[in-house]
Design a protein with these regions (language model features):
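A surface/secretory-pathway sequence property marking extracellular, secreted
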Residues: 43-90, 215-242
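Serine/threonine-enriched low-complexity regions used as flexible
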Residues: 32, 101-144
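Surface-exposed interaction regions enriched in Ser/Thr/Asp/Glu
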Residues: 235-266
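Enriched for extracellular/lumenal, surface-exposed ectodomains of secreted and cell-surface proteins
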Residues: 51, 86, 113-122, 265
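Serine/threonine-rich, low-complexity linker/repeat segments that form flexible spacers/stalks
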Residues: 1-35, 139-166
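Short beta-strand elements of extracellular/lumenal beta-sandwich folds
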Residues: 17-43, 159-195, 200
Length: 266
């Protein structure tokens, strides 16, 4: 039996034809995790995405997209909508993702996929699918607890909170500590991030004081841990008046709650 989790961004960023400036296209992830929750091996599994539907924000027109690359785990799988997962052992999972970009800003409205597997299992592939769930993707992150691998994981929204879906088939709640966190300027143009020490996974999203004009290059925790590059980032969102809001994000686990955020001007 297979559980399929899809991870779709809501917004994709490219040029907005209704603004005078030309905005750059930003690559985004369309992700899938295939978890074999049964007792038998799922042999020679392939997933082929249908053409995702991405519409332009203003007029609802379909937008073309470019596939920059496909991946199964960390292995490059070409630039097509087909991903070959091979065999998936019982009680294990594999991660797939497509890296894409569009020329225009827009949003995802629809995504479908089809599946092929070896006949040795018998029956149509749909008979093997226990559950299909689609999630709003926040970011590719990396769970770095002991025993984890070096494959990126999916941080997704769930109601008012978050969950992280890891490459070994687990999914766990993520505490949203944005409401208890603070950012303060320190020497060298850097920022001090503080929130309560927490066991478990945490995600913090706070307004970026530099409004996207500086680059976040390093995050250091008070106990000496240097966060992986996957686990801190900057984001932006378009407001109804066409202005932008800018944010700083940190994802971590079992944390002291005290960090130094190191910025660069370029």
């Amino acid at each position: 039996l297979l559980r399929l989790d899809y991870f779709l961004p809501t917004d994709v960023f490219g040029d907005d034809p209704f603004t005078p400036e030309t905005e750059a296209s930003e690559p985004f992830t369309l992700g899938v995790r295939v978890a074999n929750v049964g007792a038998g091996t799922a042999a020679k599994l392939q997933i082929e995405s249908a053409q995702p539907k991405i519409v332009e924000n203003r007029q609802g027109l379909l937008i073309d997209f470019t596939i920059l690359g496909g991946y199964v785990g960390n292995a490059i799988a070409g630039k097509s909508l087909l991903l070959d997962f091979g065999d998936i052992a019982p009680q294990s999972a594999k991660m797939g993702r497509w890296l894409m970009q569009t020329t225009l800003a827009g949003r995802f409205t629809q995504f479908n996929a089809s599946f092929v597997h070896a006949d040795s299992l018998g029956g149509a592939v749909t008979s093997l699918i226990k559950e299909i769930v689609t999630h709003k993707l926040v970011r590719d992150v990396r769970v770095d607890l002991p025993g984890q691998d070096d494959i990126d994981d999916f941080l997704a929204e769930q109601g008012d909170g978050y969950r992280v879906y890891d490459s070994q088939g687990g999914d766990n709640p993520v505490f949203n500590l944005s409401g208890t966190a603070s950012l303060n300027a320190v020497s060298g143009g850097n920022l001090a991030l503080q929130f309560p020490a927490t066991q478990g996974y945490v995600h913090v999203k706070l307004p970026d004081p530099s409004r996207g004009s500086r680059v976040l290059v390093q995050v250091l925790r008070s106990d000496g841990k240097q966060l992986l590059a996957q686990n801190f980032w900057l984001s932006k969102s378009r407001n109804s008046d066409l202005s932008w809001s800018y944010y700083v994000h940190v994802f971590d686990s079992n944390t002291t709650g005290q960090y130094t955020l190191v910025f660069s001007d370029s």
